[in-house]
């Protein structure tokens, strides 16, 4: 099935979903190593079998990743390589998803109750707004299809809603700074202890200066994951979640807390 889709001149949203599932064998949300090489090999074979040339985007992709063992792409990158239907592709090209800071601000707009999740109806409104900003409108049936596909693509724990880290897979890999924090997340007890330590005035939130101190310490302790030279970027992206410069416990937990235990 993936072969016939890779031979198409236009790939629908549902076909794109099937292609992604075919190659993302471990369900990580990214293609890397053998998965990525399988995609490149099957793409070249499928196009050749159908007597089709690789598109310029495909050629660039193959040249960039074909000889690399350390390549890694997300859904966004694949959507730009394959001839995906225009309105679905626009969801990956919108301004709100070109930088992590803009993405965080958009997340804050839709996670209005600070629950740490965006549920189905909120996701539908989010996608509708993205398309409207690109001067595109789709009917309710198509919007529902896109919403359902986004949940299937990103909802890794199948709870019917998206966490920040799941939603962040809409970002290009190089823009997704949350990946840097995946390996250093704390359990709930450790996180609460850290929050109280850096909330130096005990007012229930962390301001920019307190966050700066926390990030510096995290960078010192986790040099393999975090680069102290990128503190300004980390801080700017995290503060985009704040409420008027006040970063509350639930907001910071989205970045640094792995769970309740």
UniProtKB/Swiss-Prot annotation:
Positions of post-translational N-acetylalanine modification: 2
Domain EF-hand: 11-46, 53-88, 98-133, 142-177, 186-221
Any one cellular-component term (Gene Ontology): hippocampal mossy fiber to CA3 synapse
GO aspect biological process, one term: retina layer formation
Region (Interaction with RANBP9): 2-7
Binding, Ca(2+) 4: 199, 201, 203, 205, 210
Binding annotation for Ca(2+) 3: 155, 157, 159, 161, 166
Keywords assigned by UniProt, alphabetized: Acetylation, Calcium, Metal-binding, Repeat, Vitamin D
One GO molecular-function entry: vitamin D binding
Homology family: Belongs to the calbindin family.
Subunit structure: Interacts with RANBP9.
UniProt domain comment: This protein has four functional calcium-binding sites; potential sites II and VI have lost affinity for calcium.
Function: Buffers cytosolic calcium. May stimulate a membrane Ca(2+)-ATPase and a 3',5'-cyclic nucleotide phosphodiesterase.
Protein name in the entry: Calbindin
Native source species: Homo sapiens
Gene from which this protein is expressed: CALB1
């Amino acid at each position: 099935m993936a072969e016939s889709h890779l031979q198409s001149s236009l790939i629908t949203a549902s076909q794109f979903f099937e292609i992604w599932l075919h190659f993302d064998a471990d369900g990580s949300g990214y293609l890397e190593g053998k998965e990525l090489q399988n995609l490149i090999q099957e793409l070249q074979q499928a196009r050749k079998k159908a007597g089709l040339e690789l598109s310029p985007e495909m050629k660039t992709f193959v040249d960039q990743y074909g000889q690399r063992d350390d390549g890694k792409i997300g859904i966004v990158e694949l959507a730009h390589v394959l001839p995906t239907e225009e309105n679905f592709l626009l969801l990956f090209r919108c301004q709100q998803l070109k930088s992590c800071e803009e993405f965080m601000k958009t997340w804050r707009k839709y996670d209005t109750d600070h629950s740490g999740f965006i549920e189905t109806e909120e996701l539908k409104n989010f996608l509708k707004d993205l398309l409207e900003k690109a001067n595109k409108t789709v009917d309710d049936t198509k919007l529902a299809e896109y919403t359902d596909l986004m949940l299937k693509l990103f909802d890794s724990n199948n709870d019917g809603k998206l966490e920040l880290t799941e939603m962040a897979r809409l970002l290009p890999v190089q823009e997704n700074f949350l990946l840097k924090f995946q390996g250093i997340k704390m359990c709930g007890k450790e996180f609460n202890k850290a929050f109280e330590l850096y909330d130096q005035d005990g007012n229930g939130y962390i301001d920019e200066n307190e966050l700066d101190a926390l990030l510096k310490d995290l960078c010192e302790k986790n040099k393999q994951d975090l680069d102290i030279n990128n503190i300004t970027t980390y801080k700017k992206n995290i503060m985009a979640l704040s409420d008027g410069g006040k970063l509350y416990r639930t907001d910071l937990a989205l970045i640094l807390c792995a769970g309740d235990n």
